[in-house]
């Protein structure tokens, strides 16, 4: 019998990707296509859904060409996606009624300010989220209120809403399936994560018709069949990108935690079947497999890798990002310099939009190497901030941090991360954890892999970083960071700008 394969569709914020995996989780082929970012007004960020669709089809074809396999041997498809980004389309024509409003878009702040002032506790208790333009709910309301005939069509059932996974499943199945999974639904700010259903009271508050919303299903089951590649292939896995990365890190047990270092960083802690509430972090659904639901705590750090980009492009201190590691390693320590990357405020656990970036502790002896080191160290300090709150609010002791994303390749940073956390930092062999996670979910539901235990055997470690720093020095460094953050907080409110 011919060997079968799983293809992961990974629709991100800047590009559409596809990766072909075999049963041993080897990567056979990768396809990637970037698409346009639209900024029609300050605070607005949009994508063209049709451009995403075309980019995704090209990525699938590229991945299959590179894999050099018979297309008839694709057993199933998994879809992972940028979360919260909102698409609405006409069910008759299949065409979007407006561009996709991206998770970064801030135009709906007046809506969410109203919700925060009047319904904060209700929304937090039911959805696990804090009212913010980040999530889908206010984006849906904006489209219904501002696009001609949108509300009228929605009331008649002529319009559908979806996060990007839902839109792609609709397109792949030629309009036969209008579905999402628990993890994506939990990022809309409309889904009751306790009852596992759309929350009618929140829908009424926002005047959103329930008829436009997709069916919500577990993250590993057959949602429909993709009519592409001249065959009918089951779409059998679906998860938001950060939840897929948690699954791809084999973080199946309560207390398992991962940090993805990208432009910003996302930290997710598996809290098992326990729905843990936190004032400083988001409560979300990690995944649903079978009849069980796994919950997670999430901390979002706004600026990590973007600080390296600023050091490269803004200060022109380095030519390419990879140069920061040897530069930072050329000095034995930070020389008393701290860098707080509050370019757009601070996320978890501070949630201060008025904080601003700060470099402090500069002396005549400070060099760009000290600043480079302070930038890398800021990523580790912010991770420590979030993990501290996670342990406090969940009551779960965290023993190790699993890492992925671009900056996790930086050995100096990973060693400092282990030192400052006083815990092991574990880096996997395959860094494509998001795509791998949804490939696993897709393969499980069609029997490609028989169990999560089987998947554990296939996951391989690249390196484990053990903590080496003494306690007194660790505490001194971290107290310096906390003092630097204190000085950055509220800056824009104090002096304006």
UniProtKB/Swiss-Prot annotation:
Catalyzed chemical reaction(s): glycerol + ATP = sn-glycerol 3-phosphate + ADP + H(+)
CDD domains: FGGY_EcGK_like
Pathway(s) the chain acts in: Polyol metabolism; glycerol degradation via glycerol kinase pathway; sn-glycerol 3-phosphate from glycerol: step 1/1
Lineage summary: Archaea, Thermoproteota, Thermoprotei, Sulfolobales, Sulfolobaceae
GO CC list: cytosol
Gene Ontology biological process terms in this record: glycerol catabolic process; glycerol metabolic process; glycerol-3-phosphate metabolic process
Gene3D superfamilies per UniProt: 3.30.420.40
Pfam family, one: FGGY_N
Binding site for ATP: 13-15, 263, 305, 309, 406
The protein, known as: Glycerol kinase 2
Cross-referenced SUPFAM superfamilies: Actin-like ATPase domain (SSF53067)
Keywords: ATP-binding, Glycerol metabolism, Kinase, Nucleotide-binding, Transferase
HAMAP family given in the database record: Glycerol_kin
Source organism of this protein record: Sulfolobus acidocaldarius (strain ATCC 33909 / DSM 639 / JCM 8929 / NBRC 15157 / NCIMB 11770)
Disulphides: none
Binding site for ADP: 13, 17, 263, 305, 406, 410
Purpose: Key enzyme in the regulation of glycerol uptake and metabolism. Catalyzes the phosphorylation of glycerol to yield sn-glycerol 3-phosphate.
Sequence positions that bind sn-glycerol 3-phosphate: 13, 83-84, 134, 241
Enzyme class, spelled out: transferase
One annotated GO molecular function: ATP binding
């Amino acid at each position: 019998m011919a060997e079968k394969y799983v293809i992961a569709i990974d629709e991100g914020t800047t590009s559409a990707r596809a990766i072909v995996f075999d049963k041993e989780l080897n990567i056979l082929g990768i396809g990637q296509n970037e698409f346009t970012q639209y900024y029609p007004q300050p605070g607005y960020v949009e994508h063209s859904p049709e451009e995403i669709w075309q980019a995704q089809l090209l990525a699938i074809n590229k991945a299959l060409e590179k894999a050099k396999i018979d297309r008839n041997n694709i057993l199933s498809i998994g879809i992972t996606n940028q979360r919260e980004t909102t698409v609405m389309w006409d069910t008759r024509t299949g065409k979007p009624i407006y561009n996709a409003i991206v998770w970064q878009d801030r135009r709906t702040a007046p809506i969410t300010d109203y919700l925060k002032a009047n319904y904060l506790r209700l929304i937090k208790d039911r959805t696990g989220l804090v009212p913010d333009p980040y999530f889908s709910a206010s984006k849906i309301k904006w489209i219904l209120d501002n696009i001609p005939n949108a509300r009228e069509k929605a009331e008649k059932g002529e319009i559908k809403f979806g996060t990007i996974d839902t839109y792609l499943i609709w397109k792949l199945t030629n309009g036969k399936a209008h579905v999402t999974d628990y993890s994506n639904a939990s990022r809309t700010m409309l889904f009751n994560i306790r009852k596992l259903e759309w929350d009618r009271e929140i829908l009424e508050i926002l005047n959103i018709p329930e008829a436009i919303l997709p069916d919500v299903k577990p993250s590993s089951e057959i949602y429909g069949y993709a009519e592409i590649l001249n065959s009918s292939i089951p779409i059998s896995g679906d998860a938001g990108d950060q939840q897929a990365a948690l699954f791809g890190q084999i973080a199946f047990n309560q207390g398992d935690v991962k940090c993805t270092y990208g432009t910003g960083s996302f930290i997710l802690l598996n809290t098992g079947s326990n729905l843990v509430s936190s004032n400083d972090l988001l409560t979300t659904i990690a995944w649903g497999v079978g009849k069980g639901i796994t919950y997670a705590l999430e901390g979002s750090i706004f600026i990590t890798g973007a600080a390296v980009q600023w050091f490269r492009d803004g200060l022109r201190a380095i030519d390419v990002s990879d140069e920061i590691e040897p530069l930072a390693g050329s000095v034995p320590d930070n020389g008393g310099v701290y860098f707080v990357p509050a370019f757009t405020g601070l996320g978890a656990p501070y949630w201060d939009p008025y904080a601003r970036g700060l470099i402090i502790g500069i002396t005549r002896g400070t060099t760009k190497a000290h600043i480079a080191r302070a930038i890398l160290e800021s990523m580790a300090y912010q991770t420590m901030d979030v993990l501290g709150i996670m342990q406090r609010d969940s009551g779960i002791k965290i023993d190790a941090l699993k890492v992925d994303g671009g900056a996790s390749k930086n050995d100096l940073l990973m060693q400092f991360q282990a030192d400052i956390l006083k815990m092991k930092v574990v880096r996997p062999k395959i860094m494509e954890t998001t795509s791998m996670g949804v490939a696993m979910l897709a393969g499980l539901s069609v029997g490609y892999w028989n169990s999560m235990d089987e998947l554990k055997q296939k996951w391989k470690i690249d390196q484990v970083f053990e903590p080496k720093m003494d306690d007194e020095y660790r505490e001194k460094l971290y107290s310096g960071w906390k003092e630097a953050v204190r000085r950055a907080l509220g800056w824009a409110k104090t002096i304006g700008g």
